[in-house]
C-alpha cells in the first residue's frame, strides 16, 4: 500500500495546489462536508490548482490503484465527496470565472459556489438557472440537472450548459459540447459525476435583474384548502413564474405552510398573477421587488453547514387529497423545527425538453418532493430518521417511482436506476466507454457491468 507520506511527496512535487493528510492541522476541516452525518477519513485531500493538476491526480490514483472521490461544493446529502481511505480530489480552490457580456456566456471553474457564480454574472445583469441555496457548488448541481428559480423561463442548469472540459478516467482532458464528444456531453447533463472530473463549465446566460419574490405563509388549519388552490394555480402559471411550497414548524413549534414565488417579469403583471394566492388570507406576505442575488441567498440561514441531514425524495405529479391528508398528519409530529417538506414546481422550459435530450430524464411538469430533515444533536438522529422514513413510506401511493438524483442519499442501485429512468441503458453504455473500470464510483453510481 502506498503510504500517505509517499502520496504527499509524489503529488506535492511541482504541485501548486495543496495535499493534506491525517495528522495535518487542516485535515479535519478539509474532510468535513455540508452533512454533519458524514464522518469519513480519506487517505489524503488533494486540492489541484488547475486542470493539468487534476490530470496528474487522476494518473496518480490509477498508477497506484487507489480509490478516488471528488468534491466540488461538498453539499450533497449522500456525502460522496468523502470516501474512507480514498484520495479526495477537492476542487474548491478552482474558482476562476469569466463573463462575456457580448455573447452572454460565462466560463466557470468547478470550485465556485452558486453565490460566487451569481455575484459575477449579476454584476452585468445576467444569470442562469442554479439552485436555491448559495453555498451549493455549481459542479454537482449542474451535473445532476439543476433545479432553480429560473427553470420555467430557461430550463435546468444543465439546459444552459454549452460545453464542459472534463478529465476522463484515462487522464485525457476533453471538451464536450453539441459539436465535440456529443455522447459525453449528453451524459454529463444529469449524470456527470460518473464520467470524469469537469474542470470548466461554459453556460449560456440570460438577462435577469430585479425579480418579484418572497413568501406567503398560512396556518395548518387552512393548509388543505391552500394546497388545493395552489395545485390548481401553478398548472396555469406562465414560464416566468416559478414557485415552491415549504411545510415546516415555527420556532415555537407551530406548523406552517409557505408558498415561495419568483416572477421574472413586469411588477404589475406579477402582482396580478399572484392575486389568487393573496385572497387565501396569508398570515404574512413578504413578496416584494428584489435583486435576484438577494433571492438566491435568502435560504442560506436555514441550511448552515454541519447540521445532521437525512432526506427522502421523489417526483409528485399532483397534490391529491390523499397526499395532502398525509402531510397534514405528519407535519405536527415533525421532530425538528429546522426540518421541512418541500415541493418545488418544475414547469415551463424545463418540462418541455424531450426526456431523451439529456441524461436528466424527468421532463414532465411535476413537483420535486423532498423531505429535508436536519437537526444538530446526534442523540436526536434516530427519531428524525424514523419520522422521515415513515412519512416517505406513507407518501408512496402518491409519488412516482422516479427521483431527482441531486436529492438522493445512499439508497442503492434501484433508486439510481429510478433517477435516470429510460436513459439508464444508454448511460451504462457510455460508462463502459469512458470509465469501464469504474474509477468514478463515489457517486450515484452507474455500474458499467449494467447490474
Language-model-detected regions and their locations in the chain:
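Soluble FAD-dependent oxygen oxidases
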Residues: 1-451
